């Protein structure tokens, strides 16, 4: 009888441990989603100039009269099997104080040279935004680059995360010492955001991607750190295909 009681108590204890662990995991997943929710709920913002009037997270890193500067970055990286890795993207700095925007379009080609040591060759093309149109500030002779800049759209302009709750059973990671956190979800090719990416980019794989929400800083909010979105289609040695996006508010350099 004593042995049976010990066995029952052991099973109950194990059940409690599993329940508590699962509960903590679910709770942390909800926290990670909530930390992204304020920013992602703004997607899509078709007219980028609307960001001049949108508030972001502010703390004591901001001067009281500083409205902050929105920093937007969208990038597509494609490396076919054992070929060069090509990253193309754009960064914009949208100053809410002056309502001016500048940034650059970039093309970064990484080659494996000199005994396997990677060498990158990044070219930047400065741009500005006028009347919601992105315009090069210097002459560009390469017609393909000019067209890529003219047609460029940031993920924030067409992505949609109105219902984060549809992403479930994610692989959650949290390190309170950094602090850093992430949530990874397997999505399908029928996902709205995946369809939008395939519509705009020539993605050389039919594999469905994983969605990664990752960030650093206080989970409850901080102007220090970052929050990134990443759709990873392929990730292995010699072959990488992924899209990354970020939108965050930072203190302005000119107050």
Swiss-Prot record:
Lipidation residue positions, type N-palmitoyl cysteine = 24
- Topology in the lipid bilayer: Lipid-anchor
Pfam families according to UniProt: DUF576
The record's section on InterPro entries has: Csa (IPR007595), Csa_sf (IPR038641)
The main place the protein resides is membrane
Keywords, A to Z, come to: Cell membrane, Lipoprotein, Membrane, Palmitate, Signal
Which compartments is it annotated to reside in? Cell membrane
Name it: Uncharacterized lipoprotein SA0092
Which organism is the protein's source? Staphylococcus aureus (strain N315)
